[in-house]
């Protein structure tokens, strides 16, 4: 059986820009993408902690070290600069892959700098 699991999460990112006239997506500092293994053009789910909006888009790699979190296109209507968001990817895993799956989670500060990497291995099915 194939099931869908969280694969990576960027927790408490702050929106730095919003660009309605750009062609879709979210631009994220490439250093942050590397830390949680999110690739350019990968589908992401986003939750806005300020207004409860949940939506999906795809990723564009932003300038390294910039702290950039820019919602582009229609998604920009769902955020304000300064809003706190959570960005997640998911992976579809078979039963063998589920046991060793360990999501990557980066917790950010108010400047979108990584302050903690959380090992989600303790919360995986191998420990249930």
From Swiss-Prot:
Subunit structure, as described in the record: Heterooctamer of four alpha and four beta subunits.
Cofactor: binding comment: Binds 1 pyruvoyl group covalently per subunit.
GO cellular component, one term: cytosol
Posttranslational modification: Is synthesized initially as an inactive proenzyme, which is activated by self-cleavage at a specific serine bond to produce a beta-subunit with a hydroxyl group at its C-terminus and an alpha-subunit with a pyruvoyl group at its N-terminus.
The protein's annotated pathway: Cofactor biosynthesis; (R)-pantothenate biosynthesis; beta-alanine from L-aspartate: step 1/1
Keyword Lyase: yes
InterPro entries xref list: Asp_de-COase-like_dom_sf, Asp_decarbox
Family matches, as NCBIfam families: panD (TIGR00223)
EC number(s) stated in the UniProt entry for this protein: 4.1.1.11
PANTHER family per the UniProt record, alphabetical: ASPARTATE 1-DECARBOXYLASE
Protein name: Aspartate 1-decarboxylase
Catalytic residues (positions): 25 (schiff-base intermediate with substrate), 58 (proton donor)
């Amino acid at each position: 059986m194939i099931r869908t699991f969280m694969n990576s999460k960027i927790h408490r990112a702050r929106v730095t820009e919003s660009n309605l006239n750009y062609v879709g997506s979210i631009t994220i500092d490439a250093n942050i993408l590397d830390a949680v293994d999110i690739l350019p053009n990968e589908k992401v789910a986003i939750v806005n902690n300020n207004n409860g909006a949940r939506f999906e888009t795809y990723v564009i790699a932003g300038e390294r070290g910039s702290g950039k979190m820019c919602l582009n296109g229609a998604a920009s209507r769902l955020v304000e600069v300064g809003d706190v968001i959570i960005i997640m990817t998911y992976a579809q895993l078979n039963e063998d892959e589920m046991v060793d799956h360990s999501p990557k989670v980066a917790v950010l500060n108010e400047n979108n700098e990584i302050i903690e990497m959380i090992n989600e291995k303790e919360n995986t099915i191998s420990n249930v």
